[in-house]
A protein has these predicted regions:
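Extended, solvent-exposed, turn-rich assembly/linker loops in the middle of proteins
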Residues: 60-167
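Sequence/fold signature of self-assembling virion shell proteins
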Residues: 129-287
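Short, glycine/acidic-rich hinge or "gate" loops at secondary-structure transitions
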Residues: 31, 47-66
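Assembly/oligomerization interface modules of large self-assembling protein complexes
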Residues: 1-12
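A generic structural motif
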Residues: 16-27
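Structural beta-strand/beta-sheet cores of well-ordered domains, especially the beta-sheet scaffolds
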Residues: 14, 110-115, 172, 259-263
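Short, charged, low-complexity patches
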Residues: 27-35, 39
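Sec-exported extracytoplasmic/periplasmic mature domains
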Residues: 40-47
């Protein structure tokens, strides 16, 4: 049987021009750079559009089976200023709880719940530092660990793995997707901060909570994704004859202004999150 999905699409447009004298002098480097500019503008718009959808979906997601405060898909980190093993463990637990059956029981199809984390270079540095920093978040009496209270290092095998693989691309079975756009004050983080609107998040480990900064300059979000399920969809309109996705046309507004040559192009696409249960997050408090 065939099925169809209807979604709203939008056009991403770009236009460039250059002085006709460059073409007359066979300055192909100038002409080539205009094509590069066209591609860069479209890619930049696609990046921001996709990030806005992802961060907005995560910030607004809620599921009744979630163990996070307010049935949200986001938890807070356990230790201020640190992203620890406990936080990764809590993300796995949260993803499992979110993906319960419709009666909040065990689903017929069990998934890992989490396959990737999208994060900043600073969070990756936190992961690497587990090779030489304490990793415990609770004291021997099960209270929140404080400064100088019984610090425990990770297992020897774990620390050795982190030490030998400084440029690690995976950790605890999670693929690490490191982006410079993530992190305090960076554009993906500020998009999330705008969508979150100063929401408060709570740690599953020790029940501490904090309000995410409205500007996204003192806290950051770590995004967890389950890529075993096809829930993040990008649909692109293609030309019926050529199959091309991008349409580039000469700009006729320069027919009178003879000293300019220009062209414009556009791509029509649509993005949708079919099931926001594939998204979880950990808000890291640096305040």
């Amino acid at each position: 049987t065939a099925s169809e999905l209807k979604l709203a699409t939008y056009s991403l447009d770009t236009a460039v021009d250059f002085d006709r004298r460059y073409a007359a002098k066979s300055r192909m480097d100038v002409v080539g750079k205009t094509f590069t500019r066209v591609a860069q503008e479209i890619l930049l718009k696609q990046e921001r559009t996709s990030a806005t959808l992802l961060m907005t979906s995560l910030a607004g997601a809620s599921t009744t089976s979630s163990t996070a405060t307010g049935d949200k898909h986001i938890i807070a980190n356990a230790i201020k200023g640190r992203f620890q093993l406990a936080d990764i463990n809590d993300l796995f637990t949260l993803a499992k709880r979110i993906n319960s059956s419709w009666i909040n029981g065990t689903p017929t199809t069990r998934t890992r719940g989490l396959t990737d984390i999208v994060t900043s270079p600073e969070i990756v540095a936190n992961i690497r530092s587990m090779a030489y920093n304490p990793v415990n978040t609770k004291d021997f009496d099960n209270s929140r660990v404080g400064a100088g209270e019984f610090p425990l290092a990770g297992p020897e095998a774990l620390r050795d793995e982190l030490w030998r693989n400084a440029g690690l691309s995976s950790f605890m079975g999670l693929n690490i997707l490191e982006y410079n756009e993530m992190g305090k004050g960076q554009k993906f983080n500020t998009l999330f901060a705008t969508a979150a609107g100063g929401a408060t998040y709570t740690s599953l480990t020790n029940s501490t909570n904090f309000a995410f900064s409205a500007a996204g300059t003192t806290d950051e979000i770590v995004v967890g994704i389950d890529r075993t399920r096809d829930s993040l969809i990008r649909a692109v309109a293609t030309d019926a004859e050529s199959g091309s996705e991008f349409n580039l046309i000469a700009d006729d507004q320069y027919s009178i202004r003879q000293n300019k040559i220009g062209y414009f192009g556009s791509v029509e696409e649509g993005r949708v999150v079919l099931d926001n249960r594939v998204l979880v997050g950990c808000a890291v408090d640096y305040s």
